[in-house]
Amino acid sequence: AGDAAAGEDKIGTCVACHGTDGQGLAPIYPNLTGQSATYLESSIKAYRDGQRKGGNAALMTPMAQGLSDEDIADIAAYYSSQE
């Protein structure tokens, strides 16, 4: 399981589209607030590893490529803890 407090320090790239609270800033950006950390983690890893294509993959893959497994777990824990 990730560390939500550590995740808050790692969301710098995410906030441009998803905001600090996980509410998508435009209709094409999904809300992350309260989503399952497991779901968020697997989704971000799939983008990073090139397994998820179509939709927002062209935007998300480059954003996720620099993230370690620990970074992803922490970010997922942070956004899933938001209300």
From Swiss-Prot:
Provide the species name. Halomonas halodenitrificans (strain ATCC 12084 / NCIMB 8669) (Paracoccus halodenitrificans)
Q: State how it assembles.
A: Homodimer.
Q: Which Gene3D superfamilies match?
A: Cytochrome c-like domain (1.10.760.10)
Q: Where on this chain does heme c bind?
A: C14, C17, H18, M63
Which PROSITE patterns does the annotation name?
CYTC
Q: Which GO terms describe its molecular function?
A: electron transfer activity; heme binding; iron ion binding
Q: Which InterPro entries match?
A: Cyt_c-like_dom, Cyt_c-like_dom_sf, Cyt_C_IC, Cytochrome_c_Oxidase_Subunit
Q: Keyword Heme, does the record have it?
A: yes
Q: What is this protein called?
A: Cytochrome c-554(548)
Swiss-Prot/TrEMBL keywords: Electron transport, Heme, Iron, Metal-binding, Transport
Q: How is it modified after translation?
A: Binds 1 heme c group covalently per subunit.
Under SUPFAM superfamilies, the record lists:
Cytochrome c
Q: Does the keyword rRNA-binding apply?
A: no
Q: Which Pfam families match?
A: Cytochrom_C (PF00034)
